[in-house]
Each structure stands twice: as C-alpha cells, then as structure tokens.
Amino acid sequence: MTQAREYDYIIIGAGSAGNVLATRLTEDPDVQVLLLEAGGPDYRFDFRTQMPAALAYPLQGKRYNWAFETDPEPYMNNRRMECGRGKGLGGSSLINGMCYLRGNALDYDNWAKIPGLEDWNYLQCLPYFKRAETRDIGPNDYHGGDGPVSVATPKEGNNELYGAFIRAGIEAGYPATEDVNGYQQEGFGPMDRTTTPNGRRASTARGYLDIAKQRPNLTIETHATTDVIEFEGKRAVGVSYERKGQAQRVRARREVLLCAGAIASPQILQRSGVGNPEHLEEFDIPVVHELPGVGENLQDHLEMYIQYECKKPISLYPALKWYNQPKIGAEWLFFGKGIGASNQFEAAGFIRTNDQEEWPNLQYHFLPIAISYNGKSAVQAHGFQAHVGSMRSMSRGRIRLTSRDPKAAPSILFNYMSHDKDWQEFRDAIRITREIIEQPTMDEYRGREISPGPNVQSDAELDEFVRQHAETAYHPAGSCKMGSADDAMAVVDGAGRVHGLEGLRVIDASIMPVIATGNLNAPTIMIAEKMADKVRGRDPLPPAKVDYYVANGAPARRRA
C-alpha cells in the first residue's frame, strides 16, 4: 500500500463551519489543510442554489440535499418528517433560507453558565459574529464591515406587506425593534439575509472558500464520503474515505476536525467507535471510546404556516406563473436585482408568550405569498403567511446508525412535541398570530384565513392541526453537545475537543448544548470563527463592550 498522504489538519465537511475553519487555518502559510466534502461543487451557474428567491428548489431534489427522513414521530401521528441537510461546498448554507439571525444574547449567557463554557457568553461571542460579517449598510457596535459573509438589509420600496406585518405586531402590543441582531432581539422588525450586493446567495463556499481556495496549503476534495476517523489508541491520526469509487486514507499530523453537521457528525463518530457501546456492538464496531452522549440531545425548531388570502393584488403570487419567470430571472441574472435577489423573508418577530419567559420563545418569519417551504402546494391566489414556531422546546431526540455503510441514512428521531409545554406554545402561537393579523393595519390586506382555517379553534382542533401540519425549520442541533467531562452526556469541551480522546474536535451546530433562538447558520459560523482561534492557539478577540436588552420581568405584551 502506498504511503498515506499527510496534512496538519483534516476537516470533514465543507459546510457552514468547515469552510470557516479551512479559511482561517490556511491563513498560516505553513499549515497544510485537507477539506473533505461528500457532495459536489457549488456550481455558480445553477440558479437553484445561487438565486435567493429559488430557495425552495434545492430542497426538492438530491443533488444538494441529503433529504433524510425521520423515523415515525410518535407525537406527530407517526409522520416521517423531512430532515433536509446540505450536500456540496457550503453545506446547508448552500440550500438554507438565507435568514441572517444570530439568536438571543441570553442563549449564549446561559451556555456560559455550564461548567467549562464560561467564555461562550454573549459579549465574548459577539466579536466573532462581527468578524464573519460584512453588512451592506456598514458596521456598528453590533455588526461587522469586512467579514467574509455578505449580509443584506431590507430596503425601502420592498413589498408593503412586510411593513404591515411589523406594524400589526406592534399594534397587538408587542415591542418594535430596529435590528433583531442588535441591541434588542425581542419584538417585530426587519430581517437581514445572507445575500451578496449583486443578489447572489452568500454561502460559506462563496464567502470563505473564495478567499482560501487558491492558497497552495489548502486541498479541497469533493465527492469524498468519510467512512471513519482512524485512531492509534486514543489519538485520532487520520481519516478513511471513499472518492469516486476508490478507498482513500489520509493522516493528520495535528488534528482531525469533524464539521459534518448535527446529523452526520454523530454518525461518523459512531462508525469510528466513539459512542454508546450498546449501539456500537449492534454493528460489531470495536469501541475506541465510550461516550454515551454521541447522537443524543438532538434538538430542532418546528414551525407552522398561518396563511391568509390577500385582498390587494400585491403578493408574490404572480411570480409563480411561468410566463413571468423569464423576466424575473433575467433581471436577477444581469442586474442582481428584483424579486429573484431576495429570499423574501424580510420581516421578523421574536416574542414571549407570557411574562414568565426570560427571552423570546416564539419566532416569526413573514412571507408575502402562501406556499410551503419546499415550494410545493402553493395557494392559487394572492396571499401571505406567517411562519411561527417555538424556540427552545424541551423535547430531545437522538441519532443512531442503521448500518456501518457510510452511504446509509441514519435513524433520526427528534421526539417533536413530547412535552406539554410544546403543545401550549403552539396553541398560543396560532392564537397570537390570528390576533396580530386581525389588527387594523391588516384590514386592507386580510382576506379569508386559509390555514388552519376559521373552524379550527378548540385546543383539540389546534393540536390536531399541529400534528398534521407542523414542519421542521431545518435547524437540527445539539447531538454532540459541549460540556464538562463531569457531564456524562457531554461529547466535547468548550474548545470542541472530544472528551477522552486526543487530536479530534467537533465544530458545528451539533455542539450547541441548547439550540439558539433563531436560525442556526449565523451561530454556526460564529462557533467556527471562535473555535478557529482556539485551534490555532491564538488569544481570543477582546469581549465586546455593548449593552443588550434583558426583559428582566417586563411584561411580554402591552395591553391596550
């Protein structure tokens, strides 16, 4: 057998985290990095991934989407639910909804209360959010101006339904916020998006790898499916993978960095002999290290669409007509403008359903069209919808192997809606949304309620609607959680190092101990930026010196 190739670092997964690490680590010219990606390139000529308004298309096929399904979910009428994950350079940032949302400051302050995670508080995370970002209206105390990720803000003259929805939330007694990523997340306001100034998707492949891919010390291999991490004793020393039908082995002089995401990272650990021995023995996998938390603590956001017909003919419904699409496509392709240049999620809301919640437990995305997330089942009329879901469900799931074959889909169970609080939050979500849409500012727009429909009112009727119609927001997290070695279910420490092993870190959304309040792409990029300094042995960026909103007992809603 030929001598295995050697690199200083081997990164598994060219997604939202892996591309950040590849770019930061190769800033040191004498560090050799191999980046392995099971999917293909992010073809820049493919409008399905590059046009923001086409965001539904990559979810429909399997070129860019692993398209996993859950096991039958016991609290959801045993539905097998979608679990889409990005495949290709950029990972899930290549197929996500491009919502740039960082989470709430108290998410991170609460992580920092966990022993060993003291440096994960908000003020120590904020500099890394800023380092990653270039915001189109320039930097400030909360936002960056020269980072790899392009962030666009909503502009004057966008669809009038966005402003109407924000005003309706405020009329209903909830706060207003100028910037859900700034001083105050709580309230209704505009939503930023990860798109470039010329209207292209700002994936981490475009943002980070475009900087790094010409460097001689970075090797990128696509169509490279990782089989196992190889160990000598308790030290990770390399990776076995398959590329174009050929088995390959590479060695890591320093570390293996596992960045395959909340679904694949625990699978790879389990295949490699790291996990719960009972599960590994089912597949005759020799145990390298017993870590029962691998694949446990799995979390996600569940959401519903509350849909209405729109009385004014101003929704995006005409954009679905085939005869309008060539003009929209040309305007986007040649000028980077128009409907095609936006993901259409330009209004947000984060609210507390009661005064006891310390920070928001519901999230809204507003869309000026009535359609499902994956682009199917569009309502054939002018309409609008509010996506709403609970933020920090106590429900926990797990990921298990079904086979030693790296191409086999895992067994995924989220245990959605397994707590009483989940049901109360979703009942509240539907009722509060109806109250918001009933506000006077919506009178000129509000038509018939399409979904759930005006006859769905009682707790039992609302619960059945949730069981039948709630969908994933595509935010899996937590399956290799950070924590101290004293926590038997923690998989990594605060620097991403796998407990009990050497030369191996996990750096992606799987290490979140508790899911963030919002979409997960921006937090995952931040985690990778912060971890890059730890891997490189660099001093952390100085903590931010800013104020941030804490409700501190303030009422969740102002009553008229």
Curated annotation (Swiss-Prot):
GO biological-process terms attached to the record: glycine betaine biosynthetic process from choline
UniProt: FAD binding residues: 8-37
Cofactors demanded by this protein: FAD
One GO MF term attached to the UniProt entry: choline dehydrogenase activity
Enzyme Commission number, as recorded: 1.1.99.1, 1.2.1.8
Top EC group: oxidoreductase
Domain of life: Bacteria
Residues at the catalytic site: H475 (proton acceptor)
Reactions that this protein is recorded to catalyse: choline + A = betaine aldehyde + AH2; betaine aldehyde + NAD(+) + H2O = glycine betaine + NADH + 2 H(+)
GO cellular component labels: membrane
Record key words, sorted: FAD, Flavoprotein, NAD, Oxidoreductase
Pathway the protein acts in: Amine and polyamine biosynthesis; betaine biosynthesis via choline pathway; betaine aldehyde from choline (cytochrome c reductase route): step 1/1
Family assignment from sequence similarity: Belongs to the GMC oxidoreductase family.
Entry function: Involved in the biosynthesis of the osmoprotectant glycine betaine. Catalyzes the oxidation of choline to betaine aldehyde and betaine aldehyde to glycine betaine at the same rate.
The protein's name in its UniProt record: Oxygen-dependent choline dehydrogenase 1
Underlying gene: betA1
